[in-house]
Amino acid sequence: MPLFVRFLQTLNPTKQNARLRSPWPFSLLTQTASISSLKVAWRKDRLLDSAIERDKRCRVCARVVREVLNEPGHAIPLRYLEKRRERLGLPVKVKTFLSRYPNLFDLYPDRIKPKTEPVPFLRPSPRLRSFLALEASLRARHEPLVLAKLCKLLMMSRDKVIPAEKLLNVKRDFGFPNDLLTSLVPKYPHLLRLVGSPGEGKSFLELVSWNEEYAKSVIEQRADEEARLTGIRMRPNFTVRLPPGFYLKREMREWVRDWLELPYVSPYADASGLHPASPEMEKRMVGMLHEVLSLSLLKRVAVPVLGKFCEEYRFSNAFANTFTRHSGIFYVSLKGGIKTAMLREAYDQGELVDRDPLLEIRDKFVLMMEEGYNEYMQRLRTKREAMQKDLELMAKSNSELSEDESSERL
C-alpha cells in the first residue's frame, strides 16, 4: 500500500476509500479556507536539530582550510589567520585549533616582507595535500552527477536561466566544484552556456537543450521503482512522516488529506496554466522545494538561501510558510540562529540515510579530521600519564624522606 494512502487512513479512515475514488474531491471545489489561512504550529525536533549540530566542527574546519587554500601560494602568516577568527566562526585561538587537528597544516618560519623578522606561517600538510588530490579524483568520477544536478536546477527555473553568482553561492550546498563555471560548463556546450561577463557579476548560466533523462523528479523515480518491484503502477506522491506527538487541527487534517489526493505536479512540468493561489500550485511548489532539497548534499538548505531563488522558481513571498504547513514532509530547524529547511524522509532518528554519492568527499575529510583529533587526544593522555607518574614519584620520594627524618630523630 502506498505510504500516502496509509497516511490518509490515519487522518480519517472512514472516509479514505470514498475520497480516493475521485482525484478531484468535491471538498476542494467548495473549500472556503485559503491556503495561506491554514496555520500549523512549529514543533521542535531534537533529533533533526542534532544532525545540524554534529556537522558544526566539520564546517568550521572546512572554512579554515578554504581560507588557507585561497591565499597566494597556499600559505598565510599565523597572525593574519588569527585576525580572521571571528569571520571564520572559529571558537578557539588558531594555535589551539592547530594543536587539535595537527595533520591539517604545517607551521614554518618565513618573512612577510624581505627585511623583516621571520614569523610563523602555515601551509597545507602532506596529509591535507593527499586529501586534495583524492578530492580531485572523486570529483572527476562524480562529474556526471554534478552535471545532472546543474541541469535539473536550470530546467526547473522559469526561463531556464539562473544568475551565475547565485549558483556559485550554493556550490557547497549541492557539491559543485569551486571552478564550476570554468571547468565544468565549457565541457558541455550542448547543454550549458555562460552568458555575460563573469568578472563583473552580470553573467548567467543558461540551459541550451532539454534532456528528458533529467526531467524526472525524485518522487517520480521512486514511484517508477516501486512499480518495477511490485508490478503495480504506483501514483507519485509525497512521503509524509509526522513527528511523534505532532497534532494537526481538524480543518488542517482535512485539507492535507484532500491535498494529497490531488495529482502530483512535476517541478519540471509547465505550470503556466495553474492559478497562483490554487491547491495545485501549492502542490507544485512543495514538489519544487522537495526536489531542490533532494538535489542538495545533506537534504537541507538554509531558508534565506532558497529565498534568493524566488524569482527563478516563482516562489511566493510567503514560501517559507510552506515548510511548516507541510510538517510531515519538511522540518525547519532554528539551530545556529538560522532557519534551515530539511527533508524528513532523508533522515532516520536524526541520521542522514538518503546519502548523496558526493558525500564520499566529505566523509574522507571527516576521517582526516578524526585522525588528527585522535592524535591530539593521544598526546593529551600521554602527557597526563607522564604527569601522574611524576606526581607518584614525588610523593614516594617525599614519603621516603619523611621516614629517613623520623629515623634520625629516633
Can you describe what each PLM-predicted range is?
Residues 2-410:
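Long amphipathic alpha-helical repeat/alpha-solenoid cores
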